[in-house]
Structure formats: C-alpha cells, structure tokens
C-alpha cells in the first residue's frame, strides 16, 4: 500500500514526509507514554524527535477499515504546506499498524476555548483573538480549495479539528474524510455523505439543493464561525423553539435583520463590531443553496474588509432537526433520524458517513416538517 502512496507523492510534490520504522515511533513516544487525546480515527500521543522537537503521533484505529483514512491524510498533507494547515512530518506502515506524525500544537484544539466555561482552567480568548483565528482558518481552507495542484475538500471542518500552536495560530487538521479532485471540475461525486453532525452541508443529503462541491466546506466554516463568534454551540435541542438557545443562527439572523444589537458578555463595543462581522459572514456561508454561498477566497475578503460594507443576506438559513442522522449501518446502508432529545444526548463530534439515496426523485423536506425551506425565485449568488 505504501508504494502506491509514495509513487503518488513523488510524482506530484517535492515535499515528502518521512517514513519511520515502528521501533522509531515507539522510541519517540517513549512507549506511547503521554496520551494527548482520542479523535475520530485514533489515539494521539506526544512524542519527541531526535532534534528535540515535539510531535503529535496518531495511531490509527484498526476499525478504520482498509486504510482509506491513512491514504487520505498522506495524500493530502504529504503534498502541501501552509501556515494554517497542520504539517505532516512523517508516517509509519508496519502490517496493521498505521501511524501519522504531525507537528505538535501546544494549545490543543479550538473547541475547548470557545465552549469552555468561565471557571475552566483554559485561557480565555477575546473576540479579536477569535477573529484572527477565524481569518486564519478561512485562509487555510481557501488554500486547500485553490492553492494546490488538486482541489482538496476537507469535509470535516469543526472546532475539534482546528489546532492552535503556542501563538494561537490555527491549523486545520484531520484529513481522514478529505477528497481530492481536479481544480477544473466544479462538482465532486460521492457515494456517501460525510462529515460531523451539525456541520454537514444540506446538499450532502438533498440533491435538488445543489451539487456537492467545495461549497460544502464553506457551509461547515459558516457553522464554525457562528460558534466562534457566539462562544457557544449552534444547537440546543432541549431549548424552546425560536429562542437564542435553540438554534443560534436563526436567532442571530432575526436579531440582525430587525436591526437589533447582539450582546456578548464582557465584550467591548469594538469587539461587538468584530463579532457582528463574523456572524454576517457566517450567515452567508450557511445559505442552503451552494450557489448562494461565497467562495473561501471571498470569505477572506469579507473578513478582512469593513463590517459596514457587508451586505446582509436576505435568505434565512434553513435547518431540519428531524433530518439529522442518528447512526449509520455500513452493512445494510440504512440510517435513522434523531429526535430533539436524542440529538441533545448525542456527541457532536460523532463522524457519520451516510449512503446517498439511489432514488433520483429524492427531495427536500415538505412544509409539514419542523421548518419549511423558503427559496425565492430570485437570489443573490456567488458564482465564479
């Protein structure tokens, strides 16, 4: 398997990750002594190279199948370099053991900073810092979409997959669900929907919303930046409908559309302007139809520009609580849907892969469901 990976990298890139023997992996981690955490595809340990540099060593789970997640990581991270994308230093393949070695991110993942409570031990980041982090993430995704020989779709942009270095520079990580396709092609073919509950674009479920493209990552970024600006998760299924606690983007849209100010605890007036800009950008990114969303290049421009120059989206984002996936049986290719209480009890970090329905007449939910989709005949679009 690794001959195929190496041939691919050598033909397309001058940067080659190092292949380590397994004994070297055990040595750099001191027998996997310090466990940093566990993600969707395996456990991560702290290691140290002979040079003295610290690294994060990911041991991929055996349950991850035929090694596609390993191939995805090496085929993407092994060929690129960007300040806002985590660097793959090396890898190891030893029988069933698949190991990835990354640069070490001192401050861990973003989720613990935006979802932490005031009495938590984590450093509290102000809105200016969170804005800088958001802009860095946007630049990283834009690079994946347009800065490489092949377009790279991440398909799992979320707070847990954004790592922060010692200067709180954000780095996009975890490319296990990533897909590469030629830059000249606008639509990508998928046999299954992929991503994490709460960040998955609607076109991954409903064909007549639009084709699957890099705009799926734009949607995920929109959900992410809404959570960053609000310092909270977008969904609380146990809260009252139409309240700020139920579905944050709905509430933000209504407040801003009515000309109301959104109050954030301990935020200065200048910070509130920054938060408002981030929220407006987020609302553009989570538009239901892909063509109504900006490209990540445009997102970077919007974030770098003045808040007063931003046009407010007149399409309210749509959300279907009854259509969120609960679980997937990979053997029989069936899925079930969550109720409100089940969604609240579920892990937001659960990665799901959902087989696309073969029925060509699959359509959007009807108005009898929780929220009806309201798509006017004329819409402002971001075509390229």
What does each model-identified segment do?
Residues 217:
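Conserved catalytic-loop aspartate of Hanks-type protein kinases
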Residues 139-152:
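Protein kinase catalytic-loop region centered on the HRD/HxD motif
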Residues 70-75:
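Regulatory alphaC helix of protein kinase catalytic domains
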Residues 1-6, 55, 243, 262-384:
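Intrinsically disordered, low-complexity cytosolic regulatory tails
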Residues 89-96, 106:
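Short beta-strand micro-motifs within the conserved protein kinase catalytic domain, predominantly
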Residues 45-62, 87:
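Glycine-rich ATP phosphate-binding loop
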